Amino acid sequence: MTTIESKCSIDGILLLNKPQGMTSNAALQKAKHLFGAKKAGHTGSLDPLATGMLPLCFGEATKICQYLLNADKSYETIGRLGSKTNTADCTGEVIFCIENYTVSHEELIATLEKYKGKTKQIPSMFSALKHKGTPLYRLAREGIEIERKARDIVISQLKLEQFDGECFTLTVSCSKGTYIRNLVEDIGDTLKAGAHMTKLHRLYTAGFENNRMYTLDELQDMPLSQRLACLIPIDQAVQHLTPVILSDSEVTAIRQGKVISNKTSAVEGEDLRLYGEQSQFIGIGQALIHGDIKAKRLVSFAL
């Protein structure tokens, strides 16, 4: 195993395939150590039970973490009918059980249709959402329940992949803030059979549909040069934003906090990808009236 002994400037995005049984923060810290990065952050946690894509931002890439937090996600999940748990997944205590239930393939398909599109979801008490600074899951473990407001979510894909009468496998594409285990539980409630999630794998975060993920074991076995080659350029996380190329003098000006005049036809308030003349990523700008651009989040080096 090759590691970087002293922390250095590492900038880029790593698509980690998080292992089961590890918290997202623990996975982040292990990867940060492997790369010897000074600064690192993840873009939306996965429960310890879950596996799959966890984008990690190193160095200057941490400045665009929010765009990945806001991105749509796609998952594969398995639910089991016949019982509910206090956590809505297989790590919790069973709080409801029914033995004599019958759910047909057609009934399940019809139920899934009800959850497609725009809908509302009440987050679980066993979530990382905070109440007065305290994560809800900590309150839940103390037997405290806080009223939670239903949140707007969008489920763009909800496809039944397999069903054996008890366990069902789904592919789910959804907006940020969607709790898949709560979706599985809600489906079970609608079917009047109860359900809890037994498996969750994040297939991808929007923008990285075709990119490879790496496990911690794979990274540990790589020579340093190969490990660094796994990093993705920062601007790939914001490819959905309109690109704008600035001249060298404009790059200097915007880094000094000046507004660049008459440079874009984008709508006022729209975020933009900014590049220098040599296609180096400068950072994120924001469109103003009359086509002007101001800096919003600039990286401090030329890629």
Curated annotation (Swiss-Prot):
The protein's enzyme class: isomerase
Record CDD domains: PseudoU_synth_EcTruB, PUA_TruB_bacterial
Domain of life of the source: Bacteria
Family annotation (SUPFAM superfamilies): Pseudouridine synthase (SSF55120), PUA domain-like (SSF88697)
GO molecular function annotations of the record: RNA binding; tRNA pseudouridine(55) synthase activity
GO biological process: mRNA pseudouridine synthesis; tRNA pseudouridine synthesis
Pfam families: TruB-C_2 (PF09157), TruB_C_2 (PF16198), TruB_N (PF01509)
Keywords tagged on the record: Isomerase, tRNA processing
Catalytic activity line of the entry: uridine(55) in tRNA = pseudouridine(55) in tRNA
Catalytic residues (UniProt): D47
EC number, as in UniProt: 5.4.99.25
Record-linked InterPro entries: PsdUridine_synth_cat_dom_sf, PsdUridine_synth_N, PUA-like_sf, PUA_sf, tRNA_psdUridine_synth_TruB, tRNA_sdUridine_synth_fam1_C, TruB_C
Family per record: Belongs to the pseudouridine synthase TruB family. Type 1 subfamily.
Function: Responsible for synthesis of pseudouridine from uracil-55 in the psi GC loop of transfer RNAs.
Protein name: tRNA pseudouridine synthase B
Species, as recorded: Legionella pneumophila (strain Lens)
